[in-house]
UniProtKB/Swiss-Prot annotation:
Keywords: Cytoplasm, Lyase, Phenylalanine catabolism, Phenylpropanoid metabolism. It is found in: Cytoplasm. One of its GO terms (biological process) is cinnamic acid biosynthetic process. GO terms for cellular component: cytoplasm. This is Phenylalanine ammonia-lyase 1.
Length: 713
């Protein structure tokens, strides 16, 4: 594109091709959506981990904003020197227009509804602008509940620099360098949490950045170690080798009249939302594994016929996780046993998870692109067009893209949470979970172990709050500033509420993943216990039922196969706490097999030597003597890490997440016999998620995916 205001304007979304055939920018917006969502998330992660962010006003990403905001990463910010001339040109234009007597909003006029007032004292006007906008309330201290989180402030500073670098705002480059030094030295101004409607930008909070730069006595900052600083101390710690800035005409307005606080926080939120969206896809696949689901719900033809790209990708990701899964192979065999007595289809939380998650991923992805456009936009007023020698009075400060994107994202997060809660509820319910114990209890005595019962109550609470937060913010607009700002975006408020939703979804995700790991371990225990029961039943059958008292072959020798079928069919946790109890299904059904064979034995039952009925009591007595010891031995071997059958999860693509939770975080199987509470384990994972540690194992689960569904065969 043509050079304007002294620099090349190749913006984040505008096509720069010669003879631009996309004047409305729809083509560029569509182009940005090409490729898979997962590939985009991988690019975000790579950008997030780069040590330097170079700002030129045109290519800032939400991942870079998130990286700089989390200052513990030590990401350095650099300004593009090529932007200096454009910034300087617009600043000089403002001074020249003032000297020439040109009437410009915010330079010679009052503000908002009082713009009919006039003054020639341009510097004093900017000083008053910052003073009257310092209307926030902080409460006690710099870490109070009324102070914007310092990470969000850093995000806002970065975005505001990026906007002003484009050279349409009339501000000196030196001021942008000063803000950059604050960022690079981890000196963060204190901004008020509330008080902006993001409609003439985030006026009130941004005024506190300007207040620090101009040395206002009420301004405060926080240093790298959390120490409270006044403006002078902040300048010294940030190595800003100048006096406080005396704002020139338009410079105060340039600092405050933008959407950077709302869009900065939105960037942080969306970086996490994209990660959580991918996590929800993988967790749904693990849910299918431990629930012994039918993997045909991921078949590509089903989703191809629905056409929605988010759904197609979600299904393909789940299909990739489940393809070759040892759980799916075992489940297939289980489904072949008594198929007419089992549901033909899985419940919706499993079977329709791609259809549910797909549109939500599309919403999050579209919101990401919208906010990425916003943080690369020029969003103040008036705009200085040096090339045409004029100031343009418009409304780019209206943060509607933020409010709408955040409302939509929050709705998507709430729906992800709803699915997660439905899946969790099935997982802990022994009426639905295909043989896992109620509440995922793992103790020998289920009467003294209630497992994840408290966790399910907590999940209901999280889900309810998340659903409440899904209500829109943007429908609550109030006319403000003497009815000049009569429509306003509420962008920062919506970003804040979405940030709350992110935290709640993390609580749900950490609780759910710990529960899934518990279920994985219970399936491992189940397999070993069932193996022990089968071996014992087989051993007792051979010993008791093969021959008669005189060593002759006995008719009961044919019972063994059917007895083992009973063990295969019966859920192990329905009887394993007392396997030989006459009131539990194992002994009842083993006896029924022997009775049925005895009835078929007919006339032979009259002979004591060939009677199967005569064998029943002996068989049961032998089983009662042997089975409890064998079961306890199998459980003890499992608990000591010497299980006869290894854990299936090691052969699955979902293993990296399990390994991360169990080995890196040091969590374990929860039982009523141990002191450790579920919440302690949830806390470990939640903290790790907040630190971004879950990203690598999550991506490792999908490392082999080629970005396409399996062929339809």
């Amino acid at each position: 594109m043509e050079a304007t205001n002294g620099h090349q304007n190749g913006s984040f979304c505008l096509s720069t091709a010669k003879g631009n055939n996309d004047p409305l920018n729809w083509g560029a917006a569509a182009e940005a959506m090409k490729g898979s969502h997962l590939d985009e998330v991988k690019r975000m992660v790579a950008e997030y981990r780069k040590p330097v962010v170079r700002l030129g006003g045109e290519t800032l990403t939400i991942a870079q904003v998130a990286a700089v905001a989390g200052h513990d990463h030590g990401v350095a910010v650099e300004l593009s020197e090529s932007a200096r001339e454009g910034v300087k040109a617009s600043s000089e234009w403002v001074m020249n227009s003032m000297n020439n007597g040109t009437d410009s909003y915010g330079v010679t006029t009052g503000f908002g509804a009082t713009s009919h007032r006039r003054t020639k004292q341009g510097g004093a006007l900017q000083k008053e602008l910052i003073r009257f906008l310092n209307a926030g309330i902080f409460g006690n201290g710099t870490e109070s509940s009324h102070t914007l989180p310092h990470t969000a402030t850093r995000a806002a500073m970065l975005v505001r620099i990026n906007t002003l670098l484009q050279g349409y705002s009339g501000i000196r480059f030196e001021i942008l360098e000063a803000i950059t030094k604050l960022l690079n030295n981890n000196v963060t101004p204190c901004l008020d949490l509330r008080g902006t409607i993001t409609a003439s930008g985030d006026l009130v909070p941004l005024s506190y950045i300007a207040g620090l730069l101009t040395g206002r006595p009420n301004s405060k900052a926080v240093g790298p170690s959390g120490e409270v600083l006044n403006a002078k101390e902040a300048f010294e710690l940030a190595s800003i080798n100048s006096e406080f800035f005396e704002l020139q005409p338009k410079e105060g307005l340039a600092l405050v009249n933008g959407t950077a606080v709302g869009s900065g926080l939105a960037s942080m939120v969306l970086f996490e939302a994209n990660i959580l969206a991918v996590l929800s896809e993988v967790l749904s696949a693990i849910f299918a594994e431990v629930m012994q689901g039918k993997p045909e719900f991921t078949d590509h033809l089903t989703h191809k016929l629905k056409h929605h790209p988010g759904q197609i990708e979600a299904a393909a990701i789940m299909e990739h996780i489940l393809d070759g899964s040892s759980y799916m192979k075992a489940a297939k065999k289980l489904h072949e046993i008594d198929p007419l007595q089992k549901p033909k289809q899985d419940r919706y939380a499993l079977r329709t998870s791609p259809q549910w998650l797909g549109p939500l991923i599309e919403v999050i992805r579209f919101s990401t692109k919208s906010i990425e456009r916003e943080i690369n936009s020029v969003n103040d007023n008036p705009l200085i067009d040096v090339s045409r020698n004029k100031a343009l009075h418009g409304g780019n400060f209206q943060g509607t893209p933020i409010g709408v994107s955040m409302d939509n994202t929050r709705l998507a997060l709430a729906s992800i949470g709803k699915l997660m809660f439905a899946q969790f509820s099935e997982l802990v319910n022994d009426f639905y979970n295909n043989g896992l114990p109620s509440n995922l209890t793992a103790s020998r005595n289920p009467s003294l172990d209630y497992g994840f019962k408290g966790a399910e109550i907590a999940m209901a609470s999280y889900c309810s709050e998340l659903q409440y937060l899904a209500n829109p913010v943007t429908t609550h607009v109030q006319s403000a500033e003497q009815h000049n700002q009569d429509v306003n975006s509420l962008g920062l408020i919506s970003s804040r509420k979405t940030n709350e939703a992110i935290e709640i979804l993390k609580l749900m995700s950490s609780t759910f993943l710990i529960a899934l790991c518990q279920a994985i371990d219970l399936r491992h225990l189940e397999e070993n216990l069932k193996n022990s029961v089968k071996n014992t039943v087989s051993q007792v059958s051979k010993r008791i039922l093969t021959t008669g008292v005189n060593g002759e072959l006995h008719p009961s020798r044919f019972c063994e196969k059917d007895l083992l079928k009973v063990v295969d069919r019966e859920y192990i946790f329905s009887y394993i706490d007392d396997p030989c109890s006459a009131t539990y299904p194992l002994m009842q059904k083993l006896r029924q097999v022997l009775v049925d064979h005895a009835l078929v034995n007919a006339e032979c039952e009259k002979d004591v030597n060939s009677s199967i009925f005569q064998k029943i009591a002996i068989f049961e007595e032998e089983l009662k003597n042997l089975l409890p010891k064998e079961v306890e031995g199998a459980r003890a071997a499992y608990e000591s890490g010497k299980a006869a059958i290894p854990n299936k999860i090691q052969e699955c693509r979902s293993y990296p997440l399990y390994k991360f939770v169990r080995e890196e975080l040091g969590t374990g199987l929860l039982t009523g016999e141990k002191v450790r509470s579920p919440g302690e384990e949830f806390d470990k994972l939640f903290t790790a998620m907040c630190q971004g540690k879950i990203i690598d194992p999550l991506m490792e689960c999908l490392g082999e995916w080629n970005g396409a569904p399996l062929p339809i065969s």
